[in-house]
Each structure stands twice: as C-alpha cells, then as structure tokens.
Amino acid sequence: MLDVGFGELFCFGIIALLVLGPDKLPVAARFAGRWYARIKRYISNIQNEIDRELNLSEFRKEMQDELDRLHTLEQTMQARLKEIEKASTEKIAEQPKQPIESEPSITPQKYIFCITPQTIVPFCHQKQHYQQPERYNDLVLESSSVELKIAV
C-alpha cells in the first residue's frame, strides 16, 4: 500500500531509536500501531460501504429492468385485449339482429307460514284441524313475496 520495503523500514526504525531513545520507542511504536490499525479499519469500512452501494445499485438496476419488462408485458396484454374487444364487437355487429324472445313472466312465489304448537311450518297450505291456543290468536300471519338474489 505504501510501497515501503524492508530496508526503508529498517532505516526508519534506527532514526526513531536515535530521536526518541530506548525509553519512549515502545510507547511510540504502540501509538503508531494503534493509529495504523484505526486507519486500516476505516479504509476497510469505506471499501465495504462502496461494495454494498455497488451491489445495491446493481440490484436497483435489475429491479428497474424487471419493472420495464413488466411494463412492456402489460402494454402487449392491453393491446391484445383491445384486439379481442374489437374482434368481438365486429363479430356481434356482423350477426343479424333477431328479436329477443320474451321469457315467460315469473311471479314470485308466496310463502305462507303456519304455526303449529310445536314449530313454524313453511308451505303449509292446508287448514289446521286443531284449535290454536290463546297465545297464538294475537299473532298475525302474513304472506310476503321473497326474491332471492345471488351476488357473484
């Protein structure tokens, strides 16, 4: 990284020994080693962040490519759908117009509920052969039309 050879490192050590002396040289070497480790760690972190950003940018590019592909696919599907709609309207227009046969009118069926002492019985069309208790006399029996609708 710094292109320092063994000879240059040896010269640097001798100069440091002469300037600092044997007492302060170990403390200075420890201090320089800590700073070297910190700088190396910072450089490593920066390289990792750059690698992550590059991977993230590659991922973003891949995602954008996929979105573009999906957009193109959606456009082709829309075009095909329009072609199908156009063909179906043309086919309907080509068919001769026939009068629509009216369906027989369906009258809603009326449900009549008869009250027996035990249960309420639907579709009871026969008269009851029993005497209703007093508590059922106040109850008004009504018939109503019921339409069934199915939601799809």
UniProtKB/Swiss-Prot annotation:
Superkingdom assignment: Bacteria
UniProt record, GO biological process: protein transport by the Tat complex
Molecular function as annotated in GO: protein transmembrane transporter activity
UniProtKB keywords: Cell inner membrane, Cell membrane, Membrane, Protein transport, Translocation, Transmembrane, Transmembrane helix, Transport
A Pfam short name: TatA_B_E
Primary localization class, coarse: membrane
TM segment ranges: 1-21
Localization (cell): Cell inner membrane
Membrane topology: Single-pass membrane protein
Gene Ontology cellular-component terms listed: TAT protein transport complex
InterPro entries for this protein: TatA/B/E, TatB
HAMAP family: TatB (MF_00237)
Subunit structure: The Tat system comprises two distinct complexes: a TatABC complex, containing multiple copies of TatA, TatB and TatC subunits, and a separate TatA complex, containing only TatA subunits. Substrates initially bind to the TatABC complex, which probably triggers association of the separate TatA complex to form the active translocon.
Family in the record: Belongs to the TatB family.
Role, per record: Part of the twin-arginine translocation (Tat) system that transports large folded proteins containing a characteristic twin-arginine motif in their signal peptide across membranes. Together with TatC, TatB is part of a receptor directly interacting with Tat signal peptides. TatB may form an oligomeric binding site that transiently accommodates folded Tat precursor proteins before their translocation.
Protein name: Sec-independent protein translocase protein TatB
